Regions:
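Cytosolic, membrane-interface loops and tails of multi-pass inner-membrane proteins
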Residues: 34-67, 126, 206-222
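Loop-to-transmembrane alpha-helix initiation sites
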Residues: 146, 162-169, 181-193
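Nucleotide and nucleotide-moiety/phosphate-recognizing core
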Residues: 16-20, 66-70, 76-121, 140-147, ...
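Short, non-helical or kinked segments that cap or interrupt transmembrane helices
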Residues: 43-55, 121-134, 161-169
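Short, strongly hydrophobic alpha-helical membrane anchors
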Residues: 1-15
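N-terminal signal-anchor transmembrane alpha helix
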Residues: 15-40
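Interfacial segments of multi-pass membrane proteins
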Residues: 57-64, 85-88, 111, 128-159, ...
Length: 222
């Protein structure tokens, strides 16, 4: 009897985890830069600049008030992905401890990032996950958000290299997560999230080392 109960519990847990992963991934697929540029401006942002479907490349290429739409889209999809994830878990399991809800946020956040970076509806060519990732950090814990966003803003302002601030965000995320939540599952998920962000910036790392990386400017290139 006990074995059957545990088996049913594991099946329910796996089902809930899969549902959260799928919904978070498809939320992440709604890439603001691609949607606005391709369907509103009729000029895919991935055909310009760095070829990245992210906020920085969109601003450098198009600028204008539609940048706010890109920001709003990438922020809201991360919020929705995590909210739905929490709702799913609470629907399957009642009175879940805080640590479990936190782990769900990381799980949903990871798949939201995967959807943003590799969107199936846009030929798996998406962004680098900084804005969505930063939103996920805020949703998880203000202490994590403070370290991630604080370092990002300081480095970006001082050096004008958005990529350098982004690398800080990706690299610091797992370590501050480890400090705040020394749980093996959470640490693994945090390293997966941070590792994805750093990996997506591998070309930027090469340009930073060679001194050819573009600096951010509020005046977009014509």
């Amino acid at each position: 009897m006990l074995t059957e109960i545990w088996a049913d519990l594991m099946q329910t847990f796996v089902l809930a985890a899969v549902i959260v992963a799928v919904e978070a991934y498809f939320c992440g697929c709604f890439n603001g830069a691609v949607i606005v540029s391709k369907y509103i401006l009729r000029d895919d942002v991935r055909n310009h600049g760095s070829g990245n479907a992210g906020l920085t490349n969109f601003y450098r290429t198009f600028g204008g008030p539609l940048t706010a739409v890109v920001i709003l889209t990438d922020v809201l999809k991360a919020v929705v992905a995590i909210w739905i994830g929490i709702f799913v878990i609470e629907s399957f399991f009642t009175n879940e401890p805080t640590l479990t809800i936190t782990a769900v946020k990381y799980w949903a956040g990871l798949f939201c990032l995967l959807g943003h970076m590799f969107p199936c509806m846009f030929h798996f060519k998406g962004g680098k996950g900084i804005l969505s990732g930063g939103t996920i950090a805020i949703m998880i814990d203000w202490r994590i958000a403070l370290v991630v966003w604080g370092g990002f803003l300081i480095l970006t302002v001082l050096t004008r290299y958005v990529s350098l601030g982004s690398l800080w965000a990706g690299a610091s995320f797992p370590f501050i997560s480890w400090y705040c939540y020394p749980d093996p599952v959470i640490v693994v998920l945090a390293f997966a999230c941070g590792g994805l962000v750093v990996w997506q910036h591998r070309a930027n790392i090469k340009r930073l080392l060679s001194g050819t990386e573009n600096k951010f400017s509020f005046h977009r290139k014509k």
